[in-house]
Amino acid sequence: YKHPYFDDFEQEIPIPESEKNAKEKGLNFIKLDGAVGIIGNGAGLVMSTLDVVAENGGKAANFLDIGGGAKAETVSSALEVLEADKNVKSVLINIFGGITRCDLVAEGIIEATKGKELVWPIIIRLDGTNSLEGLEILKANPNEKIFIEESMDSAAKLAVQKGL
């Protein structure tokens, strides 16, 4: 902080372990009390994803923004953060590629899930930069708990259904 006296404010507010863990990984994460884990790129997209989940009768378990230009490792780290939350029943990954390349997001999903028995279904919506390549990567690495949806609304509906 520019003003050192602000340091005391941070020390007074207890931060959940999951938020500390995410911060160490360079992720913007806030724990919420729902069952649908949310991963997106950009605060606006994540907030609108929370809204669409709510419109479809669900409650978000978190706000997790991987930011712009996220690499495969970032996505893998985001999924690791959600694995620690026992309230998560499904995960919705909603990416609109601009700076963030959807093929790298897909690689991160495969990296994080390969050889693992997933504890929850992952619903993925990719759009934008290299989205077709990203979808091909996901299709080339099928997993019975990974679902691809074309729209944010259909992805949110499925995430809510799978999270019940």
Q: Where does each model-flagged region fall?
A:
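ATP-dependent carboxylate/acyl-activation modules
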Residues: 1-93, 105, 115, 127-129, ...
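Glycine-rich, proline-tolerant flexible connector loops at the mouths of alpha/beta enzymes
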Residues: 96-100
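Short Gly/Thr/Asp-enriched flexible loops that form oxyanion-binding sites at enzyme active sites
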Residues: 101-112
